[in-house]
UniProtKB/Swiss-Prot annotation:
This is Porphobilinogen deaminase. One of its GO terms (molecular function) is hydroxymethylbilane synthase activity. Keywords: Porphyrin biosynthesis, Transferase. It catalyses: 4 porphobilinogen + H2O = hydroxymethylbilane + 4 NH4(+). Its EC number is 2.5.1.61. Its cofactor is dipyrromethane. Binds 1 dipyrromethane group covalently. It comes from Shewanella pealeana (strain ATCC 700345 / ANG-SQ1). GO terms for biological process: protoporphyrinogen IX biosynthetic process. The modification S-(dipyrrolylmethanemethyl)cysteine is found at residue 242. Gene3D superfamilies: Periplasmic binding protein-like II (3.40.190.10), Porphobilinogen deaminase, C-terminal domain (3.30.160.40). The gene is hemC.
Length: 310
């Protein structure tokens, strides 16, 4: 492959394409003479749309095909939403870069209502995320939660067709697709703890590819890496995939990293929370320790039940 060419494996969804185009533009801006090509692909998570994600099962639903393309030499890098990236990588691949994080919050989207509090009793809310479901149900047990799959455009179309009174989406995706005007209100991390890595973009490549690693290096964002490292470490210790009722959110102030974690029963009947803070240098340790605290409070019982039903 040409020394002046990088090929990006990406999902075909508009949001995935935006992320790949963003990385392409950044690389071409930094490295004069570099050509970046996109290799759009369909993944298992994109193809199976009639089944709730929790039942499709497996970690890495949206990344496996992209990884095969890199291992076979068809692509040099893959660009992912960090919340979709499994903890373990196939031999020969690794997470080389985490770019600066966009807004990590969830967004409340409705054509009629401004906030979750405004929804009338029995209103229908669309989300396929068990993490969002458990937090909404805990706050508003009177609401009806209906599954919602598909890319951002498909989900908005289902809302507009009257299938739902409101839907919950990641704020970052709507902002990136220039759909911020669809957001009725942002849901604070206090109200809905985000997923680990939410709003951050990661770049995966072959671990032995020194040329590509050197080209990618300027895109690394140290603070985002520390925050996401803590969140992912917590998720890993809990053995969470991308479809679990787990929330994790880290913030940094100076050299101090504060981490909040949550595990909830999808029916909203029980929400277990914990928080801790420490040095940014200990991001991974903090994540593991917070997971241990959640487990000591009964998180394993909830997660075992979720996996048994999946």
């Amino acid at each position: 492959m040409s020394q002046n060419l990088i090929r990006i494996a990406t999902r075909k969804s508009p949001l995935a394409m935006w992320q790949a185009e963003f990385v392409k533009a950044e690389l071409e801006k930094i490295h004069e003479g570099l050509t970046v090509e996109l290799l759009p692909m369909s993944t298992k998570g994109d193809i199976i749309l009639d089944t709730p994600l929790a039942k499709v099962g497996g970690k890495g639903l949206f990344v496996k095909e992209l990884e095969v393309a890199m291992l076979e030499g068809l692509a040099d890098i893959a660009v992912h939403s960090m919340k979709d990236v499994p903890v373990d990588f196939p031999e020969g691949l690794g997470l080389e870069v985490i770019c600066e994080r966009e807004d990590p919050r969830d967004a409340f989207v409705s054509n009629t209502y401004k906030t979750i509090e405004d929804l009338p009793q029995g209103a229908v809310v669309g989300t396929s995320s068990l993490r969002r479901q458990c937090q909404i149900r805990a706050a508003r047990p009177d609401l009806v939660i209906k599954d919602l799959r598909g890319n951002v455009g498909t989900r908005l179309a289902k809302l507009d067709a009257g299938n739902y009174d409101a839907i919950i989406l990641a704020a970052a995706g709507l902002k990136r697709l220039k759909l911020e005007e669809r957001i009725a209100s942002f849901i604070s991390a206090e109200q809905s703890l985000p997923a680990n890595g939410q709003g951050a973009v990661g770049i995966e490549c072959r671990t032995d590819d020194a040329r590509v690693k050197a080209l990618l290096a300027p895109l690394e964002h140290a603070e985002t890496r520390m925050r996401v490292t803590a969140e992912r470490a917590m998720n890993t210790r809990l053995e969470g995939g991308c479809q679990v009722p787990i929330g994790a959110y880290a913030e940094i102030d100076g050299d101090t990293l504060s981490l909040r974690g949550l595990v909830g029963n999808p029916d909203g009947s029980q929400i277990i929370t914990a928080s801790s803070s420490g040095s940014t240098a200990d991001a991974e340790k903090l994540g593991v320790a917070l997971a241990e605290e959640l487990l000591s409070k009964g998180a394993k019982t909830i997660l075992d039940a979720v996996y048994a039903n999946a």
